[in-house]
């Protein structure tokens, strides 16, 4: 089953996490690149001109702001992070940013998906489509995922990882995520006391 972009948010006995996967049929020549406080989705070497074909293929997919990790499938990662940095709650930052930026104005009306998790275990996940906006709380000790296609409502999922590398690997092709086609690249942030970032 093809779900497009996928993200997961939650916590387990080892810590809190956000994870992101690019699945793509149109622009498969992308990679994730880690920086000290963020992970970006960028074209692979030799495909830099793809950004002129679509404004939606290069963006920060994860950003760390204070004690919160933000994850999304587009430029709204930065908007959400900036709202949280200004003092807004996670729930309100997700809701306002998704509502303001709306779904992507491409041929597919691609939804914007987003999530965030704080070191205290508070986590939210959300989506905006052409006909709905959802922001749900993820209970402590649980994980939920959402995707741009097919699975456009938050779904509880067993997510097995003890660090950021394992979280990135898990959303790429482990557990339930192994059933979803066209994986391209993935990334994750994981924290027990401090956020660490990994990308594949």
Predicted segments — roles?
Residues 1-200:
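Conserved short alpha-helical segments that host acidic/polar catalytic motifs at enzyme active sites
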């Amino acid at each position: 089953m093809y779900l497009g972009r996928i993200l997961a948010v939650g916590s387990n006995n080892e810590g809190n996490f956000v994870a992101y996967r690019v699945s793509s049929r149109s622009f498969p020549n992308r990679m994730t690149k880690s920086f000290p406080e963020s992970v970006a989705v960028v074209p692979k070497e030799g495909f830099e001109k793809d950004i002129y074909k679509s404004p939606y293929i290069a963006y920060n997919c994860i950003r760390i702001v204070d004690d919160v990790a933000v994850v999304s499938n587009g430029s709204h990662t930065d908007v959400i992070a900036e709202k949280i940095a200004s003092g807004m709650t996670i729930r309100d930052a997700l809701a306002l940013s998704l509502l303001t930026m709306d779904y992507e104005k491409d041929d597919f009306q691609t939804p914007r998906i987003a999530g965030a998790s704080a070191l205290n275990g508070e986590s939210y996940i959300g989506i905006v489509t052409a006909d709905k906006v959802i922001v749900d709380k993820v209970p402590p000790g649980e994980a939920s995922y959402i995707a741009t296609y097919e699975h456009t409502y938050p779904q509880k999922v067993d997510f097995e990882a003890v660090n950021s590398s394992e979280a990135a690997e898990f959303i790429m092709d482990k557990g339930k995520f192994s059933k979803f086609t066209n994986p391209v690249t993935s990334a994750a942030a994981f924290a027990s006391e401090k956020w660490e970032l990994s990308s594949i």
